Amino acid sequence: RDRLRSRGLGDVYKRQVIRLFPSRYIHIGGDEASRRHWKACPKCQKRMKEEGLKDESELQSYMIARIEKYLNDKGREIIGWDEILDGGLAPNATVMSWRGTEGGIAAARMGHYAIMTPESHCYLDHYQDDPETQPLAFGACIPIGQTYSYDPAPDSLGSDICKYILGVQGNVWAEYLPTYEHAEYMIYPRIIALAEVGWTPMENKHPESFKRRINNEIRYIRTKGYNPFTLSEQVQTSQTVDYAKKKIMLSLTSEKHPIDIRYTTDGSEPTVSSKL
């Protein structure tokens, strides 16, 4: 029953993790655990019955709470991915919210600290441009503008909730990154956008100013021997409709700066002499 303290995981944390990492926080994971093995395990089912646990989610939370108590007794605190919420949150745990923002917000509402790292904005191993033009990567496309647009602590949550949101984190998983140069290519410059997300209030963000600065930063990063992604020259369009004036306003932008965008309004192909 007390195997955690005498051997097994307790031994791993005591002899390896705690010795190697002097930090206050220890990340214990807790994500993507398939519970079908626990369903089929007689020992797991026996423990669930003994402890009055109604399902395997509660079994995971039971184990995480025991790990937390062990580490708290050693003067440490745990961080876990948002799945640790599923069967009930350990008393002092910090939640790292990756499956969207809901897990982090739920933890903050419960008075627990949260770190926001939603896959939709913070996963730097995902494509950053058209996959047809990029090295093999994981997941969907997350361009730098999407990362920059993220607001980890919106005013709508209220200050009583936002005070529990510690910040943001960028994640880079290396399955598709065989070299350091490839990792640099995926990390830079999106990590700079994420840094601004962490320290700049939403009302102080200026996308056009950031676009100018980030292009300068890319040039600087290259002078230091790194291998950053070159921002896309692809033109993005957005439109707004003024119903009162019966007009449609079309905006043409690009990640690249400076760049000349030429256009026509008669359906013909733009040329170097077309309007800017």
Could you describe each region identified by the protein language model?
Residues Y25, G30-A33, Y188, P258-S268:
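Hydrophobic/aromatic-rich, well-ordered segments within soluble, folded domains that form packed cores
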Residues Q16:
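Substrate-binding and catalytic surfaces of secreted/luminal carbohydrate-active proteins
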Residues D11, M48-K54, V172-L177, T200:
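Glycine- and acidic
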Residues G75, G80-P91, W98-R219:
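Conserved alpha/beta catalytic core and glycan-binding cleft of carbohydrate-active enzymes
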Residues D2-L9, Y13:
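Single conserved hydrophobic/aromatic residue that forms the stacking wall/gate
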Residues P201, K205-L276:
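Short, compositionally stereotyped local motifs that mark structural "simplifiers"
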Residues R19-I26, G30, S34-A108:
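Gly/Pro-rich turn-and-neighbor structural signature
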